[in-house]
């Protein structure tokens, strides 16, 4: 008999060789009908795979992230089977699950392919799904695997096999299709009830622009037809909220081919939005004891060699800049933390000085392939709201708790109320990916776990997702459409203080290493703004709106009074514009609604005679007429409410 520990802590005994599906059946038939795979000792397995020793087991369904991923990976295989049946001779690259479904890279040879083919392929996928063919795992020798794909004349699978060791190779078969794959997969194709092919694009084999361009087909599947309908409805709403579309309409940012791909240009309204976000966080940081610092956009290569960033991110960096006479190598700054370490070292530190909190809105640069760039969410130059806290070991937990408070304050003010904290730990089976001693990692991981529990955060733990220098706490925020985004992050780091030989004099008059905390409530400011735009559909809170008011004179003769009102509001830092176009007031109101300006101040003869303004809120609510002084008071009280959370 073997002992199986379930997520609720209960322990059950089973015969050796029990499968996860067998465990599910022992609990209830209803559960078994929904089990897609299982997490066995932290590793995702097929539900049909035998368990031969004491293990912890989590049964995975569609409601689990890993369950969805397995479902979509299996769907990619089913898509490949349909393509092979419809287009004999097709060659296949890779077909992974992604965050929003799956794709398969395909070589159709000389055959032209377009979205016009989607309907026939979808029908074939559903036809094959109804056959309820099992996904069967098989291990064979590398020699036999090479022989199989040589016979099929599939150069891409042979290329993949070249990079694998000479041990056993895993194949998966469903129906008439066999693929090279580690798995895992769902029990059978019958779980797949709805399919939608979303788009087609070109993709170079292995991401190498010198290799052949394959056809990448994106798709998504669901266990119920209604879930597909709901998903497509959300997609339509997402198109309306797309930050690239709204960014252009609201005149926030732009891109220029001459400036370079992935390098956003912030227009006046967008720059004002950024400035307000930065000032909001800067004020909160002052209250929390942070000190501002500023570092250059480039750094000597040796700085990043010392920090370990060059070895880790060198391939993602731009080429070095060489000084013409000294021959030094400089890199565009990929991270702010090495610079902050050097600031710490500018003078001796005592235990009485700690914690020291340095904060900077620092722009960093990473090389991303052109195909990976996407609006503001994936760029080559971005600004981090970076802060680094240098503290004593006994202060780590307290400082971590304070940072959690700051992150949650930011989220609450900006309306992100649905979030999960992801505790990202080191993979104990793959320690070579990380730097540092085991004892330091254990201390850091324990500090994060305890602080998260103390704050009552809803958490998930992910092995292998830690930064190379330490564990971290990432906040996974759900937006208005239910999509998850990784925004704020907090990291404990015992490694950089060692690499930079940071010291402080302790109460024992001896030298000690400080602990370093990395924190960024926004993360990338560009990415945060993109998510915020889509979350609020461009309807920013009053305090954050680039244009907070629009003054709409009914005719030209009221322009002087409109200017007077504008000047009085500007003194109070109330920003906006005067629409003095020769247009009817109805058109001015409609145009202002499209611009999502929170307040419209309409001025006609009555308002001029009474020294007032007629106030209309975005969305159509009429607040009547007010004296300018009364409006200022009302405006300021509205902002105070939004910031007092």
Swiss-Prot record:
It is an enzyme of class 6 (ligase). It catalyses: tRNA(Thr) + L-threonine + ATP = L-threonyl-tRNA(Thr) + AMP + diphosphate + H(+). One of its GO terms (biological process) is threonyl-tRNA aminoacylation. It is found in: Cytoplasm. The keyword Hydrolase does not apply. One of its GO terms (molecular function) is tRNA binding. Its cofactor is Zn(2+). Its main location: cytoplasm. Residues 1-61 form the TGS domain. Zn(2+) binds at residues 337, 388, 518. GO terms for cellular component: cytoplasm. Binds 1 zinc ion per subunit. The keyword Manganese does not apply. Its EC number is 6.1.1.3. Residues 242-541 are annotated as: Catalytic. NCBIfam families: thrS. Belongs to the class-II aminoacyl-tRNA synthetase family. Homodimer. PANTHER family: THREONINE--TRNA LIGASE, CHLOROPLASTIC_MITOCHONDRIAL 2, THREONINE-TRNA LIGASE. Catalyzes the attachment of threonine to tRNA(Thr) in a two-step reaction: L-threonine is first activated by ATP to form Thr-AMP and then transferred to the acceptor end of tRNA(Thr). Also edits incorrectly charged L-seryl-tRNA(Thr). This is Threonine--tRNA ligase. It comes from Cytophaga hutchinsonii (strain ATCC 33406 / DSM 1761 / CIP 103989 / NBRC 15051 / NCIMB 9469 / D465).
